[in-house]
Design a protein with these regions (language model features):
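Charged, long alpha-helical assembly modules
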Residues: 254-346
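Noncatalytic regulatory segments and standalone regulatory/sensor domains
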Residues: 146-262
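Short helix-capping/linker segments at secondary-structure and domain boundaries
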Residues: 38-47, 274-281
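Conserved active-site-adjacent core of cysteine acyl-enzyme catalytic domains
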Residues: 13-44, 54-194
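Charge-dense, low-complexity intrinsically disordered segments
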Residues: 23, 70, 93-96, 189, ...
């Protein structure tokens, strides 16, 4: 009589991290940071997470391969890795060329009750109902279900967890859309020890962000820094010759005023961080950094409305473009002065 072989039937796996956290907020990256740091037992505001990560930046990209062809972006590079590098241990985005392997790696961390930050493209998140590519969007992943082929993630201002199919999850993480192509970027958030004192971290975070802005730093979108604000200011009058000048101006308005940037290109979110920092570190109060950043934020808010007005014209308005150029130069001068002062903080 032949022997009988009994094999194990592989059932679809399902996992949701207990006590997952999502506190809806303003900006994808800083919301994701606050969610995962809260999960690990630390009560930090979104503004504090943004500030520690050094979230301020400025990119200006001109290319016929992107839409719009003149694109600004007002957040700095590497905010999420910088945050963890300052509070815990050296951290960088990890990458994986194979999208199936990247998915399995994410599931393995979830199985260990460790949430994962990923970068994705908004176009592949159905709940946004967007046909526009926006790669680099950061969310936190808290669970998966093999039977329904679904992952569960927390995203910015949306309540609760969002269900995303494995197919869309993989496509979003591997999006090659310019100007920020992705390669399944992720950070597993495993804090194995108490984080550093914020009184030590905050001054270092301030100086780091200031140096990045003065010296310039390269990220997935190119170079970020105050020099790019000057370049943008010089080029604004030339927008009249861009075939998509309306979209250039409208997109600029949106990324400064509307797209999760706290109304002023993240400058008011950073102001709120500075206000908290001044409460914790009394010597900072005398420098009036939060008040100075509030004024810079006002200038960014006003700039956004000029861009909006430009976008609503029937044809390029040379006077408005010249005004926008002048205001961008003022921003360059104000930000340069601010960061140079911060670098000198002892």
């Amino acid at each position: 009589m032949p022997s009988l072989c009994y094999g194990k039937i592989n059932k679809p796996m399902k996992k949701l991290i207990k006590n997952w956290v999502h506190i809806p907020g303003l900006h994808c990256g800083s919301v994701a940071l606050r969610d995962v740091i809260t999960y690990h037992g630390y009560n930090l505001s979104e503004a504090m997470c943004f500030g520690i990560g050094g979230g301020l930046g400025f990119y200006y990209t001109v290319s016929e391969d992107i839409s719009p062809t003149r694109m600004i972006f007002v957040r700095g590079p590497e905010m999420e890795p910088t945050f963890f590098s300052l509070i815990d241990k050296p951290t960088s985005w990890r990458h994986e060329k194979d999208e199936d392997k990247a998915l399995e790696t994410t599931k393995e961390w979830i199985d260990k009750d460790i949430p994962v930050l990923i970068q994705t493209d908004v176009r592949y998140l159905d709940y946004y109902n967007s046909s526009t590519n926006f790669p680099g969007h950061v969310v936190s992943v808290w669970g998966y279900d093999d039977e329904t082929q679904t992952v569960f993630l927390a995203d910015t201002g949306f309540e609760g967890l969002q269900a995303v199919s494995y197919e869309k999850f993989k496509k979003g993480r591997s999006s090659k859309a310019p100007a920020n192509p992705l390669e399944n970027n992720w950070i597993e958030v495993n804090l194995a020890k108490p984080i550093r004192s914020l009184c030590e971290v905050i001054p270092e975070a301030l100086r780091q962000n200031a140096r990045k802005m003065i010296e310039g730093r390269r990220g997935g979108r190119g170079e970020s820094g105050v020099s790019m604000i000057r370049l943008w200011a010089e080029d604004l009058p030339n927008w009249k010759d861009a075939p998509d000048w309306k979209w250039c101006a409208r997109f600029g308005y949106q990324v400064v005023k509307k797209r999760g940037v706290c109304g002023a290109g993240f400058r008011w979110l950073y102001r709120d961080f500075l206000t908290e920092a001044e409460e914790m570190l009394l010597p900072l109060r005398a420098l009036r950094l939060s008040q100075k950043m509030d004024l810079i934020g006002n200038k960014w808010s006003n700039m956004s409305m000029i861009l909006k007005e430009i976008s609503e014209k029937e044809k390029p308005d040379r006077k408005l473009l010249s005004l926008a150029s002048d205001k961008a130069n003022e921003l360059w001068e104000s930000e340069q002065q601010f960061y140079r002062a911060v670098i000198e903080i002892q």
